[in-house]
Amino acid sequence: MLRFTHVLNNGAKRSALSLGRSYLRGFGSMHGPRVAVSTLIKKDKKPNGFRGMLALFVGIGTLAVSGLSTNLYNDQNVKEDPWKSVSVDKSIDPFPTELKAPEFPISTEYVMLGFGIRSVTFISFKVYGLGIYAAKEDLGLIPKVLDSNFLSTAFIDFDSSKSHQENLKTALDNPETSRILINNLLDSGIRLVAKITPIRNTDFNHLKDGLVKSILGHPDSKKDEDRLTNGLQQLRDAFSRKGSVPKNNDLLIELQANGYLQVSYFDRKTGESTTMGQVKETLIGKLLFSQYLSGPKPLSPSTKDSVVSKLVTLA
């Protein structure tokens, strides 16, 4: 012991202290109290012999165990998060896999069908994160519609060598048959929510113009101009609110069982939600959600593909 103390007090003192510093620096990067650790080293640059050095390393060990406990706790939280939320884009908060009142201004409980990003493709400009949710009580409508005898015979189950789910995936990936299948699903009265979360700061006017443009881009929008004109005016009236929409806030568009659209806004910073207005012309909601979920150029291909995968598993 005397020989060890002598070596520690002389030749090995500096390297041992350096080791202590290095270890503490590493520990400080693991969510530990970096300032407190630095202070500890600064106050006791030259530990008093073996006892001083021993005390230093006992302190290191105590902090390390504390840090390890903290990290284990955080790891447990991380493991639980994927069941409750999904990461859509690093610029915005993860999307919850369920939407419930009163946190969100919606009429019932919704579960996620899929998610993705809405982008301006020619410049790869990300506009907003998009999540599509279905009412939990309405999930039974999905197999009822997409596994019906009529649709299965006329549009889905053409390849007898494949399962119904495989044929359904092919049909929903087809621009033409996907329109038919999704329109039938929308006509069933299924309740849906589109959660729109801007990736960059924007304003209500830009969001409104984007929705109007998307609806006008649907080929069926030309079939009934009177209903379309009336419905778009109702949508514009719902966006009478002015001002900015910071990134990471939510615009919620709820397609209700009667075909009405309810437009709401959730301010993440204040935690306040506001019902902005309602669109009673049912054509508007049908065209908008059809654009999200079907056709040759869905508004968000990644969202559409994600929803299709979920629909196939539920059908």
From Swiss-Prot:
Its main location: mitochondrion. It is found in: Mitochondrion. One of its GO terms (cellular component) is mitochondrion. One of its GO terms (molecular function) is intramolecular lyase activity. Keywords: Mitochondrion, Transit peptide. Residues 1-35 form a transit peptide. Belongs to the AIM18/AIM46 family. This is Altered inheritance of mitochondria protein 18, mitochondrial. It comes from Kluyveromyces lactis (strain ATCC 8585 / CBS 2359 / DSM 70799 / NBRC 1267 / NRRL Y-1140 / WM37) (Yeast). The gene is AIM18.
